Amino acid sequence: MDAPASFSLGAMGPLLRKLDSLLVAPEIRLPKPLKEGIELLKEDLEEIGVSLVEHSVVDSPTHKARFWMDEVRDLSYHIEDCIDTMFSMRSGGDDGKPRSERRHKVGRAKIDGFSKKPKPCTRMARIAELRALVREASERLERYQLGDVCGSSSPVVFTADGRARPLHHGVSANLVGVDEFKTKLNRWLSDEEGPHLKVAAIVGPAGIGKTALATELYRDHRWQFECRAFVRASRKPDMQRLLGGILSQVQRRQRSSDAYADSTVQSLIDNLREHLQDRRYLIIIDGLWETAVWNIANSAFPDVNSFSRILITADIEQVALECCGYKYDYIMRMEPLGSLDSKKVFFNKVFGSEDQCPPELKEVSNTILEKCGGLPLAIISIAGLLGSQPENPVLWDYVTKYLCSSLGTNPTLKDVVKETLNLSYNSLPHPFKTCLLYLGMYPDGHIMLKADLMKQWSAEGFVSANEAKDTEEIVDKYFDELVNRGILEPVEINKNGKVLSCTLHHAVHDLVMPKFNDDKFTMSVDYSQTITGPSTMVRRLSLHFSSTRYATKPAGIILSRVRSLAFFGLLNCMPCIGEFKLLRVLILEFWGSHGEQRSLNLIPVCRLFQLRYLKTSGDVVVQLPAQISGLQYLETLEIDARVSAVPFDLVHLPNLLHLQLQDETKLPDGIGCMRSLRTLQYFDLGNNSVDNLRGLGELTNLQDLHLSYSAPSSNEGLMINLNAITSSLSRLSNLKSLILSPGAISMVIFFDISSIISVVPVFLQRLELLPPICIFCRLPKSIGQLHKLCILKVSVRELLTTDIDNLTGLPSLTVLSLYAQTAPEGRFIFKDGTLPVLKYFKFGCGELCLAFMAGAMPNLQRLKLVFNIRKSEKYRHTLFGIEHLVSLQDIATRIGVDTSTGESDRRAAESAFKETVNKHPRCLRSSLQWVVSTEEESHPLEKQHHKREKGSSAGHGVLEKESVEDSEKNTDRVQTLLSPQLSNMESVVESALTGQRTKIVVKVHMPCGKSRAKAMALAASVNGVDSVEITGEDKDRLVVVGRGIDPVRLVALLREKCGLAELLMVELVEKEKTQLAGGKKGAYKKHPTYNLSPFDYVEYPPSAPIMQDINPCSTM
């Protein structure tokens, strides 16, 4: 039996294959009697396995048959556990301790559950016991008279062939029939409705398109608001996470809602009110179920006459009315789609357009659409099913008959959603159903990453590789098919249109939840001790303990039998990992306030010899065992948290495919032994040894590599590292994705990595070389040889008009982010045929100098431009040929202005932008954002360029010297920015402003590597700064040295962009420092080649919500 593990067959397929392997494995010498016993056990299992398969395809089996199938499935798990216990050898030390620390030496390898290797006679007796259990199951099959399969007719199962046309999620073209609602809501969002805070609601039944409309409005109008947030609520929302998600977005921080773990609900409310005071904000709460949730959240939103708006979506009209204060004018009741709009959605999904629908299917299509009742979710679900095999007449006939019989003449909209989703589910092949039912491990409304699900499905054994495709390709197909059928709801989509994260629509959740219980596949326990699923023999257990400190596991669960554990909640509520002896999948996601307890003890995992997947995330410190090489089956190790120490034998895990640790983590020497690795993130070039850098070249199976640089080094050290990594990359022939990012750099550094481009594999698909450490002098010509490249993000100091020709050799490029520090004398001209499949183009430069010829970028959908304007510049004719971009849908522009730019300049630039957009034959979604182009948008090299142009000795970059009035305003703000003990430092501040060399220490909230990189980049961009360093035990002290730095302005900038910032010290530097921490010269010597692209790190405000786990749209 080649079947994978599944909800219907249990572990029968993997068990039979495992017995086969035992019988033929040359390294396992079985005594003849034991071998014969295993052969007989296998024969007995095959016999009942055939009956199990026959009964599993019956739509509604009898109670006796269901009972027997449950018993056999459980027996398959039990026997596989016994086989694993008998034949899987333990190696390594107890509890992960080094051999030198053990009190008692262990002379022989141990087996889980046994103190020593069992004797052959013991194993033969155990095999005999297992055979007896199988015979009993076979006898019950006969006693229950289940030999002849009976029950209702089996559902028709249709295997997807991959031809379904996915919807382009998030694109306005997919929203049909909502023009009236959009017009009304657009007016409500505008200033015409008055300055007071307004609350509106979109109401309608499940599947009618409320979330899609709210997302569309958010995309269109977010730029009009200084603060904005889009969050998703669930039926039992954790208010701490919900409010934390809103706060993280309105503050525009690169942090998740979990970063507010120690904050109480009241403190989050207070912080939100303080931050939103006197600001215009837009808050969208999607899927509100209870007014109690609204009453708490609403207390965080001040009404300050700032034209702020709040939008909610709800299924229940009474909830919407209470949120809107019973103002019926602000209730938008969505109605089902009309006939024409329904046809547009349906035919576009199944055939591409109505014109491509065969004539013989027109009538049956109309019948199906009539039964769908105009509900978008129902239409998409049925269209996704039919689109998998659009030319299969049996499928069309089956769908039509099912809908006609189950929905009758006047079905309710609720019945329509239920039956269409039920049809889509029943038509799924068993492996697809298994993967869907597995999502019962996650809380209702949880955002799930596609990459995580794929690895978990693989670790659970839900897929079996074949000669044509490996496991990763198969699970990718499963995921995409569940999305295409409307069963999984996309949340985050990248620029290529690929779904990165998803959630279960609550209507789908309601459909599959009973199936979780019926098939005894998973069991969920929440903080209220509510049990979802069977409480007898649990194989997959999910604990949701996020709302109480004293939640405990319910009684009656045998933890030693659990194969998969997912924990969501408080650290001090998590059961001991050591009790779960047979774990294969371990998911730990910590929420809420942990108090003083921050340490997560994962030392017992060294005894989980069947473990295949381990992921943990949260604001905790993870303690791993000193030795981990006993986990011979481990495929995925992802720790999104701080690690106290990495096991020294990590490099000896033979089956590890995916390794992800936070940057700044030093891996043990010998990484070249990890030849099975496919994913490595992050590998820190500054913290790892040169031997490890060279060892990377041995990882010939590596496909995804994310490099970071988080430690300072001498120029000599940088060159050694560069040579080592260049040599290694030249040998990674299977590499598909390469990313190099700054990480949590503690010093501003720069080195030329042009040599890397010349050695990367020609089949590379993704290349991101991010500033500040990756700034090319010129665009490397060798980039044009990477013909398979799909994603390219790169920054250069100087980009010549002829360099664009290097990109014409990239026929597969779909995403291009390009930043140039210096504008060319001419224009960048994209000619006919250039970048034929490009969908997203982001271009940043000091001046806008682009031209598109007819035929250029024929598939470009989104265009993002970043440039500066200055006083009295001419703004017309800065962007040529936008009308030639025939597929363009969105254009976003971010324009930097300095203090010399007047209102007339802004109006002129805005008028020119609108005029350019209006040239396009289509009605484009457009946005224009103004930012201060002080040092936020300039780079040190740009500043030097402007200094030379102006002949200024003081040199203030793009900005002219502050006026006396501005200086006085800053002096007035000194008291609010200084810490209390520095209230008498005004004289030192004045000395700093006069140009004397000054050392400034600021305490900044920098919880992660990205936030540190951002804070350093901000500080480094300020006029007069010579060096920037991060110090302090918690890495929260920013030390800035330079001349003429305004401390008040520096702190104000950091406070605005990073949240919390406090000035701790300002002192005059008498003489040049000569020692770095660690004894190296040049502590305060500024690296003049440091540059920061506003492209990826200094983007104010972000183009979309930072919270990826609740973000309805992705702009990357």
From Swiss-Prot:
Ranges where the record places region Disordered: 935-971
Location(s), subcellular: Cytoplasm
Region ranges (HMA-like domain): 1000-1070
Name of the protein: Disease resistance protein RGA5
Residue ranges constituting the HMA domain according to the UniProt record: 997-1066
This protein's domain notes: The HMA-like (RATX1) domain is responsible for the specific recognition of AVR effectors.
Annotated tissue distribution: Expressed in leaves.
Domain of life: Eukaryota
One Pfam family cited in the UniProt record for this chain: LRR_14
Organism this protein belongs to: Oryza sativa subsp. japonica
Iron among keywords: no
Gene behind this protein: RGA5
GO cellular component labels: cytoplasm
